[in-house]
């Protein structure tokens, strides 16, 4: 039984319950795509499993290519094997990034701010492992990230990432409005080299959504002139929900983020969305977010 996706179908492997195989719909992958897969197999992240403390097992957190699969007759590359991710026991991260979506499931309904901060920290761990392999996520959207009931975060569709092999780059041509860094808008992504700073923008969006139940550009009360601009225009202007003196105000029914979160964290959001709109190099890194979240979780526990 296969699980169809946009680019291919994932099948279980007989006799290997911990592995699956992805077979592409396209019967003839171009040379660059084949080279990219070979590069990913040869340059795996240092660590792409995480200890599930409840079960005592190491579970995969990246659906990273393990081995190339070729057609028996032609010898053409047609897919790859990867570690099996338990998608039945997980939800896409957007189901946790809003209170309304969390109410749909008993286990997500009880995810308070402290637990969501823990998920955000696990997401930082995941991004760090990907960057350690010289990869850039690129298509860092709300459907490529899964969260399990044990709060472990996993990323799928890894073969769409930007991969670097020595001095050669294999680009990520995908994008998702609301998560793509503003400096990439309007670019030919098939010829654009992405940098870690573009992932830092997407990471900050996810952390904002996880902690505040709102998107920094989609939500908020628009108080500027005329119609509310599209999300990507607001992002390019550095106009985010909660910006001091900005045009996206906090909804009357919502708590001001400055009351809910420490000033140090709000300054990171300012660097990511406001100052980082014109200078991507100053966006907070994965390590900065991880340290801030670690301190926040510690303070949250002490107040429980």
Predicted regions and their residues:
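Conserved C-lobe activation region of Hanks-type protein kinase-like domains
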Residues: 196-198, 207-266
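Conserved end of the kinase activation segment
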Residues: 184-197, 220
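Terminal C-lobe "cap" of eukaryotic-type protein kinase domains
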Residues: 271-301
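Conserved structural core of kinase catalytic domains
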Residues: 60-119
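Activation of the activation-loop gatekeeper triad in protein kinase-fold domains
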Residues: 157-162
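Conserved activation segment of eukaryotic-like protein kinases, specifically the C-terminal portion
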Residues: 169-188
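ATP-binding glycine-rich phosphate-binding loop
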Residues: 1-34, 56-61, 71-74
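Catalytic-loop of the protein kinase fold
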Residues: 118, 127-150
């Amino acid at each position: 039984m296969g699980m169809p996706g946009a680019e291919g179908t994932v099948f279980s492997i007989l006799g290997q319950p911990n592995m699956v195989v992805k077979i592409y719909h396209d019967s003839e992958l171009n040379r660059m795509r084949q080279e990219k897969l070979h590069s990913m197999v040869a340059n795996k992240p240092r660590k792409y499993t995480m200890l599930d403390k409840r079960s005592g097992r190491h579970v995969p957190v990246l659906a990273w290519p393990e081995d190339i699969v070729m057609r028996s007759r032609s010898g053409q590359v047609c897919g790859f094997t990867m570690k099996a991710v338990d998608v039945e026991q997980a939800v896409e991260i957007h189901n946790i990034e809003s209170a309304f979506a969390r109410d749909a499931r008993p286990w997500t309904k009880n995810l308070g701010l402290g637990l969501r901060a823990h998920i955000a920290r696990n997401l930082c761990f995941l991004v760090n492992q990907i960057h350690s392999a010289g990869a850039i996520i690129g298509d860092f959207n709300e459907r490529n990230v899964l969260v399990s009931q044990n709060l472990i975060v996993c990323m799928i569709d890894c073969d769409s990432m930007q991969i670097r092999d020595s001095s050669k780059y294999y680009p990520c041509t995908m994008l998702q409005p609301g998560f793509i860094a503003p400096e990439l808008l309007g670019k030919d992504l098939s010829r654009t080299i992405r940098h870690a700073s573009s992932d830092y923008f997407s990471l900050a969006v996810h952390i904002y959504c996880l902690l505040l139940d709102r998107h920094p550009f989609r939500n908020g009360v628009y108080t500027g002139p005329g119609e509310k601009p599209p999300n990507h225009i607001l992002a390019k202007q550095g106009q985010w929900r909660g910006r001091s003196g900005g045009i996206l105000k906090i909804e009357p029914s919502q708590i001001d983020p400055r009351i809910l979160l420490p000033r140090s964290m709000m300054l990171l959001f300012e660097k990511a969305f406001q100052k980082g709109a014109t200078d991507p190099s100053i966006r907070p890194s994965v390590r900065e977010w991880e340290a801030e979240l670690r301190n926040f979780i510690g303070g949250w526990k002490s107040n429980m």
